[in-house]
Regions:
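Secondary-structure boundary elements
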Residues: 76-81, 118-125, 164-173, 181
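Short amphipathic alpha-helical face segments that pack within enzyme cores
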Residues: 69, 158-162
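Conserved catalytic cores of phosphodiester-cleaving nucleases, focusing on short active-site segments
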Residues: 74, 114-145, 163
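A structural signal for short, well-ordered beta-strand segments and their strand-loop junctions
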Residues: 32, 84-86, 127-130, 171-176
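Metal-dependent nuclease catalytic regions and adjoining charged, substrate-binding loops involved
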Residues: 141-143, 148-153, 166-224
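Short, glycine/acidic-rich beta->alpha junctions
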Residues: 108-111, 152-158
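Charged, glycine-rich intrinsically disordered N-terminal tails and low-complexity linkers that flank
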Residues: 1-73, 77
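Active-site metal-binding core of divalent-cation-utilizing nuclease and nuclease-like domains
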Residues: 86-128
Length: 224
């Protein structure tokens, strides 16, 4: 944590030599569409003033265990086969340590990590895949409130759209795996099988440059 100087109702810090990049997680926050974070929190992180320590829990653990299952869902249930590219395919094992959590080293301001890619027959990238786990019996609202009509929440869609934009593609596929805490999905994520038959998967496909913002009256929102 850096030294902070209080100036009445504002603060100032010594500029950092190397600010942290804005990731897809933080991008929706700075444009005001993430209800779970604030622009000030992102500012503190990027200036290296302060960052909330990451602590793994049953929710993050479940996501890590289920993610490879979603890769198989993409390959077999959705029929993409060997067109599915994972971070391990590109960077090998321990890809986070190898890349420092940034798959866009040549981009000065924005960065982050995509979950998976879909390539065409020519092996060129066609689509960015963003994977989410959705709790339906928690405090953060029902599945219907967050994935209305099967569409991803705006802040999550914007996160995935940034990664697509940085890769120069316009197609995004969001995959949400529905988990029930009361059912024990978070305690035993290894038993969760994402499939349409199990009715525990939502998918939303859209273009990164123009998509519908979920507000009363619904209007088209240009991201970039």
């Amino acid at each position: 944590m850096k030294d902070i100087k209080w100036n009445g109702s504002t603060i100032s810090v010594e500029p950092t030599k190397k600010p942290k990049k804005l990731t897809g997680t933080h991008f929706p926050t700075i444009v005001g569409v993430n209800p779970f974070s604030s622009p000030f929190e992102v500012w503190c992180r990027c200036t290296r003033t302060y960052e909330i320590p990451f602590e793994g829990n049953k929710y993050t653990n479940a996501g890590q265990i289920i993610e490879p299952k979603v890769f198989d869902f993409l390959r077999y249930s959705m029929g993409f086969g060997d067109r599915v590219i994972t971070p391990e395919d590109v960077y090998g094992k321990d890809h986070f340590k190898k890349t420092w959590g940034d798959f866009y080293p040549n981009t000065p301001i924005f960065g982050g990590m995509w979950d998976a890619l879909i390539v065409g027959d020519d092996r060129k990238i066609e689509c960015v895949v963003e994977i989410k786990t959705v709790q339906v019996d928690g405090r953060s609202g029902s599945l219907e409130e967050r994935w209305k009509d099967g569409e991803a929440p705006h802040y999550q869609a914007l996160q995935a759209s940034l990664y697509a934009y940085l890769l120069g593609v316009d197609k995004v596929l969001m995959v949400a795996v529905v988990l029930k805490d009361k059912k024990g999905d978070y305690e035993h994520p290894e038993q969760v099988i994402p499939s349409y038959a199990n009715e525990n998967v939502y998918t939303d496909e859209f273009k990164a440059t123009v998509y519908r913002r979920r507000t009363p009256g619904e209007w088209l929102f240009k991201c970039f």
